[in-house]
């Protein structure tokens, strides 16, 4: 059985929907180590997939203590509980750990330099969890998208802009992956078998997010003004480490095409 934290959230709800033999964890708000130990033990789960987090960068900057508890302390509680009961732990990290790297990328797992509190806490989480539980898997996830009205994401941003005919802004100088959430869920069975460590996790691209957006609009047959925004730091990952173990994603463009086909956009 797979116990999923954050089961009502953007990532968690899709894992609950598509993965076999899942259970939703109770809320982790204000938990203690003892509470987490009891939750894990009573779940009878073989695997814990931790998706719950405070992921808004601005929120983390405004309240670093809350960010630390949610993004570092709770994963450590889970790692201790899984270590004591010999369970596999999968934690979602972020491509933001590359947000201050000095070169342009694409970045491999060793070349990290966080540029904000959220990113720093995610990187600290990875290190502390792996110190406790070396078999744990850290997934450095990209900006994920899906047809999901409860949370803004790349797809909903584009569709809403088409509806309102507002312009969107993306930089022709920024390279980053974006990932179809369906493919995240489809890869979880292989993720569970990964050796412990950190993995770049998502779709790869050789085109800027500005180019990708224009191609996606062409694919949809829609007209929209795409402004070329000022250059932003790349979040451009090399995902070959996970791919060696069979974790496969469509390219960014192919993923968007698949998503459009799935939802008949």
Task: List the model feature ranges, each with a label.
Residues 1-19:
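N-terminal Rossmann NAD(P)H-binding glycine-rich loop of SDR-like oxidoreductase domains
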Residues 127-176, 183:
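NAD(P)-dependent short-chain dehydrogenase/reductase
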């Amino acid at each position: 059985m797979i116990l999923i934290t954050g089961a009502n959230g953007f990532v968690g709800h899709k894992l609950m929907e598509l993965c076999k033999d899942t259970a939703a964890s109770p809320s982790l708000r204000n938990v203690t180590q003892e509470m987490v130990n009891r939750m894990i033990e009573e779940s009878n789960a073989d695997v814990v997939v931790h998706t719950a987090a405070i992921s808004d960068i601005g929120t983390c900057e405004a309240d670093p203590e809350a960010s630390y508890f949610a993004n570092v302390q709770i994963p450590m509680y889970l790692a201790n509980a899984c270590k004591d009961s010999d369970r596999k732990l999968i934690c979602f990290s972020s491509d933001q750990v590359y947000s201050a790297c000095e070169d342009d990328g694409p970045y491999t797992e060793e070349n990290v330099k966080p540029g904000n509190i959220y990113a720093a806490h995610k990187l600290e989480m990875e290190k502390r969890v792996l110190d406790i539980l070396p078999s744990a898997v850290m997934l450095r996830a990209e900006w994920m998208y899906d047809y999901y009205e409860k949370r803004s994401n790349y797809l909903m941003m584009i569709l809403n802009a088409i509806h309102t005919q507002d312009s969107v802004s993306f930089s022709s100088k920024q390279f980053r992956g974006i990932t179809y959430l369906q493919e995240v869920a489809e890869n979880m069975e292989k993720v569970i078998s990964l050796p412990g460590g950190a993995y770049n996790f998502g779709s790869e691209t050789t085109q800027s997010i500005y180019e990708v957006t224009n191609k996606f609009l062409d694919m949809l047959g829609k007209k929209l003004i795409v402004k070329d925004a000022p250059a932003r730091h790349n979040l451009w990952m090399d995902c070959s480490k996970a791919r060696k173990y069979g974790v496969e994603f469509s390219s960014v463009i192919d993923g968007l095409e698949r998503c459009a086909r799935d939802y008949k956009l």
